[in-house]
């Protein structure tokens, strides 16, 4: 594990993550409009179901899987990865599948705002159930506020105020961040190719179990709640995809090197399996 930590520390890709995360969430804040949030809030049943699925059902599933696979080296990682659904890929899929884009944006916005509280709360619960995991509550909360909440709040505020530079910078940031995510999709796995190959067999069962469980739970619960097809599609996409940069950020903040490896494998499986399935399936 020490060798793995050295490889993670030496990764140029991972060193850029903490710098780019605030930029990413600032941009997200500038793209969030009050109108889209109001539109989403009008359907309270769908919004309540969607937000509860993200901040309660997914983390709870991660905790359950971590207990089932407690002897696996990545048992802690699966619990943490499911704290960060959505992300860049989910937004693209929602657009292509003609899902509920305001719902997708609002989900990401709300979960970003409350993420310091929800993440720390779930981390506390995880630490109780997994003896090998400990973390500093105050330090982690402050780091998440600085990296996620404040940049998002600043972006939302300047957009709400209609400041002239927002529109001028938005196109640049949009292209920059898309390029950045594309680049790290290749550079991250390339830099860490040896541990990815070494630990692939240990992680793949957890990843597949997670994806299948999410799919089945979401489809069953959405039928019980009786939400529209477009909303169902959007929520499923958000749940199946993983916020790659956030997962890597958590691995750095919490000093869990194996989580970076698991996060990359989870992300790659999402790209290779979930994305084609989502695009092909009606």
Language model: regions and residue ranges:
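Alpha-helical transmembrane segments of multi-pass small-molecule/ion transporters
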Residues: 1-282
């Amino acid at each position: 594990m020490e060798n793995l930590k050295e490889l993670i520390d030496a990764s140029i890709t991972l060193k850029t993550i903490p710098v780019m995360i605030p930029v990413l969430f600032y941009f997200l804040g500038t793209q969030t409009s009050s109108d889209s949030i109001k539109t989403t809030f009008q359907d309270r049943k769908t919004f309540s179901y969607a937000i509860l699925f993200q901040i309660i059902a997914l983390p709870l599933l991660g905790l359950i899987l971590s207990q089932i696979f407690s002897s696996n080296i990545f048992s802690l990682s699966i619990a943490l990865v499911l704290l960060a659904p959505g992300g860049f890929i989910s937004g693209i899929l929602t657009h292509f599948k003609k899902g509920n884009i305001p719902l997708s944006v609002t989900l990401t916005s709300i979960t970003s705002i409350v993420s310091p509280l929800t993440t720390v709360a779930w981390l506390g619960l995880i630490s109780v159930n997994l003896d090998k995991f400990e973390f500093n509550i105050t330090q982690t909360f402050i780091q998440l506020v600085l990296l996620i909440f404040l940049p998002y709040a600043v972006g939302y505020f300047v957009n709400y105020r209609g400041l002239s530079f927002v529109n001028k910078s938005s196109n640049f940031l949009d292209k920059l961040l898309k390029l950045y995510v594309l680049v790290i999709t290749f550079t991250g796995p390339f830099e860490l190719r040896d541990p990815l190959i070494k630990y692939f067999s240990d992680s793949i069962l957890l990843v597949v179990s997670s994806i299948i469980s999410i799919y089945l739970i979401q489809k069953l619960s959405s039928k019980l709640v009786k939400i529209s097809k477009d909303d169902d599609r959007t929520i499923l996409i958000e749940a199946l995809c993983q916020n790659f940069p956030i997962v890597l950020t958590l691995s750095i903040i919490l000093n869990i090197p194996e989580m970076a490896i698991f996060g990359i494998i989870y992300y790659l499986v999402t790209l290779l399996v979930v994305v084609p399935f989502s695009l092909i399936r009606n």
